[in-house]
């Protein structure tokens, strides 16, 4: 499966457990790996056949700025759900939300959460291979 990557998208948003984090806001960095097929887009040289990473970056920014979460785990989960439902051709994604200004009182580069979510095929079958087969269906 092919990948389109967005690395270190900087978003200023209001997420965190502490009241000050939700009032003042802080910087978050988002990495997104979008799993899709780029074959047709590559052969036709046509953006309509691919996932527009500019649109995805704008959607991530808007989503994180318009919603408030206490945990970056919750932000990642809801953002993944939104992107999967919105994005045509997106089969799976890996999101990492980094919180470089995390208020832990110790020197660190960043704290982050990384999740992978995607679509799964499900099959529904009717009937049985035992007994009165047509009777079960009817």
Show where each model-derived region lies.
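N-terminal, polar/charged subdomain of small-to-medium soluble alpha/beta proteins
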Residues: 1-124, 128
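Nucleotide and nucleotide-moiety/phosphate-recognizing core
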Residues: 121-124, 133-138
């Amino acid at each position: 499966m092919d990948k389109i990557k967005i690395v270190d998208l900087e978003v200023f948003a209001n997420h965190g457990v502490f009241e000050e984090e939700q009032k003042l806001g802080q910087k978050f960095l988002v990495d997104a790996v979008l799993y899709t097929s780029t074959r047709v887009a590559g052969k036709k040289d046509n953006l309509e056949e691919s996932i527009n990473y500019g649109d995805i970056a704008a959607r991530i920014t808007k989503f994180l700025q318009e919603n408030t979460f206490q945990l970056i785990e919750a932000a990642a989960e809801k953002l993944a759900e939104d992107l999967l439902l919105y994005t045509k051709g997106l089969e799976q994604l890996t999101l990492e939300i980094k919180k470089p200004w995390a208020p832990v009182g110790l020197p660190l580069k960043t704290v982050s959460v990384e999740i992978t979510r995607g679509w799964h095929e499900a099959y529904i079958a009717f009937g049985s291979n035992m007994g009165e087969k047509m009777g079960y269906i009817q």
